[in-house]
């Protein structure tokens, strides 16, 4: 049996907002067709809710919701996002709430103000009117057949400022018929201890209403405070794939989900597809036209890469000595990086990885290691150069000729003043040694 046995206990719902909050991140953008493909991929993975955008905020989101009506999703529910009614209008008169209905999604998520600073200084209305705005908006959407998730914006800041009023805003949403009350750390400034304490108090205050958390990464704690919220009784977690989002990003679902399943023993609908989470991460980056994070926990190429000789040696003997989970559980793999820090174990593991079997007692291995370290000292790098490593290994241990022989090379650098640019040209001449092909 695997040493990483998973025992499920409590069910947690995953709410993905990559297509809405994620697109507010710098350099993140999806086409309408791209958003549809992302929604399908998220559904295949098994998330519970997919927040598709804000109807009326831009033509792209409007087009997405039109196209989304044609989707045949197996697991997830599409959610439209918007705000409570304006202070000067009734819910049925508010054009933004009408657009939320026109999106024709089974779920609508609306946010309202919790922090009195925002109520009086941003909305410029009264505390009492804000409570009515929340209740009226939720009830209007509920009466029109929508499941409503209420996002309590700036909840933690508002609670610290005035706990009684913060709870009153949630009570207003509950009276309106919200199926979930999600507490938002909108500024991303709260610590784990604060979120733990506040979520526990809210859960105790609303024992029969599901509580969610929506956190940001401004303090580098987006994942930690999200897990803290779940630990304190929340049953829904919001976030984005790869943590994309405004400023420093949203809580990263590609880190949260494995932790919930593998470390906290929570039951998630997507647990059966956990080994696809790295593929999902790469897919989202590709669709958003952004570079992947090499060091991302669980899903990054470096997540299970061993460079130090001691680490590689220990991992070769006992896999979990330097790996906190089996990489395959999240669709990743163990990698060995060869450098001047490498020892015999590192070289042997790397050689095996590229299809070369080595004898640990081989007298050439010691000389090869010395040569490798000398080359690294002189500035050569083999960490990301598997082909160069293999060529050196073949020459050193097997007495083979290189697969090619450098005959000559020429490098020219010049400046074309008319075009105001520097032009470089490099030409090499090689002789290839090809394997003999025998007739069948």
Model regions: which residues?
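Active-site mouth loops of central-metabolism enzymes
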Residues: 18-33, 82-90, 121-127, 154-163, ...
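Alpha/beta enzyme core
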Residues: 32-45, 92-110, 114-120, 128, ...
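Glycine-rich, proline-tolerant flexible connector loops at the mouths of alpha/beta enzymes
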Residues: 48-72, 81-85, 113-124, 154-158, ...
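Alpha-helix-loop-beta-strand connector modules within alpha/beta enzyme cores
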Residues: 62-83, 132-143, 198-211
